[in-house]
């Protein structure tokens, strides 16, 4: 720590910071534009000027840029000196000479950093009376609106997009006072993280186009801390609502997960929550096939009669639903009748992952920690498409060597102006094994393209080369043997090694082979730091599997063999998992089927009793991410408040009410805390989830935490078009939040789940500075989430039961999955804007096969699989090996059951 003097006051600050960051960390406001905690310092805007003095006798001092000045012990500076105040005000005035006077119609108004800084420097009168420079705006795609005339040339956008995210289709053009930030020509931004430009831009150059369609100011929305449900990373998000619709999703700071960035799917893929076609009332199909709309009590009565009529009812849960909902279903049908909805293949993968996490003497890094590794090996995962935020972290890890070089020469971490020159020459090692090309190949030192079986063989060879107790592989060619020696040497000689794999290939063997490599490194060098990241396909795959249960194949088999009489699906679409033929056969009789869901899935439409449930924005619950971190998401609004005819309930409420009526007992789950207490008592692994911080009884100074900013307006007229009498605001009995602007909303050590970032004078996302102990580091309250797996010190043996297959010429075509960020995740497929931007379905075929068959791009291929005919255009891959065909697994018509199936004729 260093001691500095600021306007005659003494502060102890972090000596590794620059003066700007140090002052912000101790609560001193200095205006800035080009600096950002994520991007470091550039010194481009000259806005953060302060006066520095040589000693206490110096009365004149000199102007310095605080973002480019390192902290030195005993430094004497003034922020309030007349010279620095006049200078900062003049800089804002200069920046505004070409800035339009359009705050009232700008989407950034109300959470604009430029507005905040203008107020901070007390600039209120413009002296510029001449014509303003104007630019033509570009079309940047359906998600981001471009308004170049608002630009102040802070360079944040190009530094993030090109230097941080490695984007290549965005840049800066021009010179002097006439620069342009955009693409060479109109077009959709290619980066999967382009949406972060919206929050990083301090003005309104880049704004959320999806929000603009139904716009509200920041202070007029109701927020709740949420968890992104689109993959297993579990990024923290802030969800904004108005008039019963989700209007905007923003990044919610979490130091060890997403910090300042989320992917575009998490930011823009929410419109399925607003669909008017969503089920909102219970329905019942009688014996005459008539559809009847029910009220709550009628639906419960039919549900109770259903369970009394059938002896054994199978309950099928879902990995896209919370632990609470799955547990409620398990309690209703019994543990022996419960299925978590996973296929046999996926279940084996998740079991292996859980076994490893429970015995994790090998380190499990957080998303942020992935950025610190110097050698990374990725096996069987297309990270950019399946876990995009992990791919961005891997990109930072490859560039981490730049910081090592800077440390060698004493260049501070925050001084990023030299990064681009160093990074071209020095990079860390990334090795990838996959079936076909991925978007990380551009930074990979070596990519190996082969079938899953061959990937397992190569991974096992690496493990054997490191430690001879691993399974031995024979028949590797000489070129691959050289690569095995190279990679094994790099893995063992690095400072920190990371192995990444997961369940998206539906191969248990690739997961075990990945773990074997990590174990082999630990056996050979016990003090070597090695980490393992194992990704799953859904937000709560680990949570669902911890509850146990049979596979979906076993459940359907029991129903076909009449070992069970009926089934209840909870937020689960059978058509996504099982072949269409099997589904149609199964749904011939709908009398024995109940479905709960918040989307009109094909399964929901074919049920006897259909119960509408709340989605992740309308309910609260717990999910577990890939590292075993249990995280709570919170209800944003009450959907029944805006439309009293709605009959939407949390799935656990439907299920528990039915169970209570069947057993003629009193309802004992009155709120979410009661459900958590029940499963924490039954499953010891969940005991840590029961924490006082998340208890619904938590109060700060006697107040609940407000979901809305204090300036929220129009509450009394929200429903005036329906009824002029203002109804009572809904009461949230499940959480510590209030559906109101009345309550506590300031930084506090008791609350790590923050609905929105706001602080007096700080309305933009830069307000997160005020919620952190030190700017860019941990929150005052600490990170949210609880690691449920304890550190395990005892070493375990390598997997010796991996099936190693020799290379043989394939007779049939083998189906493998390919993924796209937009289109493969289940719920976002219902989102209209995601549908518009989903690539068309195609069959991916290797170049050698295409040449043999005389196929080229967009040629049509036909085949039959799982008793269904397919007709698809062809896309040709340079690297896909012979007799492999890639299909868009997870999309409508392409169930998970297709993976690994064989096609005889193509």
Swiss-Prot record:
| Catalysed conversion reaction | a quinone + NADH + 5 H(+)(in) = a quinol + NAD(+) + 4 H(+)(out)
Q: Which GO molecular function, any one, fits this protein according to its record?
A: 4 iron, 4 sulfur cluster binding
Give the top-rank taxon of the lineage listed in the UniProt record for this protein.
Bacteria
Source species, please? Buchnera aphidicola subsp. Acyrthosiphon pisum (strain APS) (Acyrthosiphon pisum symbiotic bacterium)
What family, per the record?
Answer: Belongs to the complex I 75 kDa subunit family.
In what residue span(s) does the 4Fe-4S His(Cys)3-ligated-type domain sit?
83-122
**UniProt keyword terms in alphabetical order:** 2Fe-2S, 4Fe-4S, Iron, Iron-sulfur, Metal-binding, NAD, Quinone, Translocase
Q: Please state the gene responsible for encoding this protein.
A: nuoG
The residues that the entry says bind [4Fe-4S] cluster 3 are 228, 231, 235, 263
Enumerate the spans annotated as 4Fe-4S Mo/W bis-MGD-type domain.
221-277
Pfam families reported for this sequence? Fer2_4, Fer4_Nqo3, Molybdop_Fe4S4, Molybdopterin, NADH-G_4Fe-4S_3
Residues that coordinate or bind [2Fe-2S] cluster? 34, 45, 48, 67
GO cellular component term of the entry, any: membrane
What cofactor does this one take? [2Fe-2S] cluster; [4Fe-4S] cluster
Cite the InterPro entries for this sequence. 2Fe-2S_ferredoxin-like_sf, 2Fe-2S_ferredoxin-type, Mopterin_OxRdtase, Mopterin_OxRdtase_4Fe-4S_dom, NADH_UbQ_OxRdtase_75kDa_su_CS, NADH_UbQ_OxRdtase_ferredoxin, NADH_UbQ_OxRdtase_Gsu, NADH_UbQ_OxRdtase_Gsu_4Fe4S-bd
Task: Describe the subunit structure.
Answer: Composed of 13 different subunits. Subunits NuoCD, E, F, and G constitute the peripheral sector of the complex.
Q: Where is the 2Fe-2S ferredoxin-type domain?
A: 2-83
E.C. designation(s):
7.1.1.-
Q: What does this protein do?
A: NDH-1 shuttles electrons from NADH, via FMN and iron-sulfur (Fe-S) centers, to quinones in the respiratory chain. Couples the redox reaction to proton translocation (for every two electrons transferred, four hydrogen ions are translocated across the cytoplasmic membrane), and thus conserves the redox energy in a proton gradient.
| Keyword check for Cytoplasm | no
**Protein name, as recorded:** NADH-quinone oxidoreductase subunit G
**Which GO biological-process labels does this protein carry?**
ATP synthesis coupled electron transport
Q: Enzyme class, one word?
A: translocase
The residues listed in the UniProt record as binding [4Fe-4S] cluster 2, with positions renumbered to this chain, are 151, 154, 157, 201
